[in-house]
Amino acid sequence: MKLTALKCPSCGGPIELDEKDENVGYCQYCHTKYYLESEQPKVFIEYKPEAFRNSMATKKESGSKAAAAAGAVIGVIGLLALILVPLSGTSKNSSRYPDRDMTAAAAASGEQSREESKVPVTYSSSFEVLIKEALGMSISSVTEEELGRFKYLAMRKGEAGWLITYSFENPAEAAEQGQDADIHVVVCQEALKVQDIAALQKLEYLNLDHTELPEGSLETLESLKMITCDYIQLDMLRLALGSRAQNLERLNASHLKSLEELSGFPGLKALEMEDCRDIADISALAQVKDLERLKLCDMDEVNDFTVLNVLKKLKSLTIDAENLKDISFINHMPELAHLEITDSRILLLDPLLGKESLKELALVDNSEVRDYAPVGTLAGLETLVLNKYTSQDDPDLTALAGLKHGEFHGMMGIRFLGSLTGLEELKVQGCNVDQPSVIASLPLLKKLVYRKNWGNSDDLSFLAGCQGLTYLDMNHSEFYGDVSYAFNLPALETLILDSSSFEINFDRLQDNPALKALSLNRVKLYKNIEMWSDGMVRSINYDNVLLDENTEFLAHYPSLEYLSLRENQLTDLQFAAGLKNLRELDVADNYVTDTHVLDQLEYLGKGSSVKRPVADVDWIDTAGDFH
């Protein structure tokens, strides 16, 4: 006895039997595979929505004999203990991962009823891949404890498919402790489903993009503290989290249209909003007065920022908004330690005067500022990013003796650096280099970015005095001078000269076992440089040099683990034979045809103790991000 109108419990689609195996069925809509347990009689059930079944139960017990027969069939079903489950989950695994199966314990004991029956939770093929890659097991054998290892999950569409990023650590918390979390990526053809995410109940940080979230769909995530989302509105997010919204501590959201539902997240300590151009009113921020970190980027429709006066617990504030005209609200923030103002219309920096709590300050592209002098009164600063690019006088920064990280753009001179003897990291870009030797006078300097400067910027001899440098980046720059001083620095581990032109005096080069990472992508080499000026125009003569004809100089650096030489018209890789420690070599977009020499390098492609160097770009990186 059987009912042949079988429907998929997940989507309601018809299930058809496999012609070769009558114990297996496939949903014609979602393609889920099911089987009928062989120990029991073969009975097929047509699953119907609960409301439909209840309405049927209330009908009068009158009808044809056919209706009575159908009722008898249902009675038989209650006794026969049918188990209908997806193929990858069997009854013996239901105790390990019950939500994966059709949970038929009630049927087996004769207690199955309309109220107790459960629709099966089916998981996507991408989730199967994720579990296999991350845990080395199938979804049918994984336990809740093992699923609880996932702390971070992100999902976005890439060229190769969906990139599922995961970690067994919380990367945001690791970053706060100065550590890097181990993050892994799995490429899948489809996005994860909401029910997949809901199974990872111990997630702490979730990153979603363009995802539809049904009500209550994330309520199982009992440990969730941080969410990054794009094109997901606050009302949908609040309903999806249910009671868990109360516990959310950090929210990074892009493309929001309204802040009206912000009160649904009373536990927020950190809020970041980016590219929310539809929002003109931010008064709802008053509903989250316990905020400690706030970031408002691309909020160009906002004109009124007075609500910030009530956020008295803020420790970090970042604003990128072209209608911001005043920053007096910082006077109401006694614990403010990090402040970043970008692309504003502020005229006066007077509220900064003597702001003792500030440790980090970034002022970028605020072209209407009349006077930067208040910056010089912040004696407690440890990090300063000053993007000036105006003809106004540079501020007197001699009082900032505690500064450890400095980025200076568009300054009229750099002599002031001589008083900042505590600097450990320095970026000088677009500045008038009136006294290059002052950089060599910084005794603690470890990291230097030196790009696109003018004045005496071609004189690179000052580098010889930077004996403590471990990192040097001079990418995207034109130097009519000799950079061999950089190659000889005894402590230098990373050197980046991408997309730059310069001279290398190869005769001056010395063996340097400290250098482990070198990037020379798209370089232009000179020699015999001659320059003269008539006071108005500078003339330059030089001879071109081919890197392909001078690669033997790389033998001076036997400890190299990372080497990148993209787009240099290279025809030969013989230079690599002596670089026995190479882990990674990038020679793309060259003219190399014979790569047999690489077979001699036993470590190539086997991981490196040195991070791949990333060249500095024009955008300002500051210490305030809480991603």
Enumerate the predicted regions with their spans.
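Short cysteine-rich clusters marking metal-coordination/redox-active sites
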Residues: 8-11, 27-30
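Concave beta-strand-loop units of leucine-rich repeat
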Residues: 152-193, 202-217, 223-236, 247-258, ...
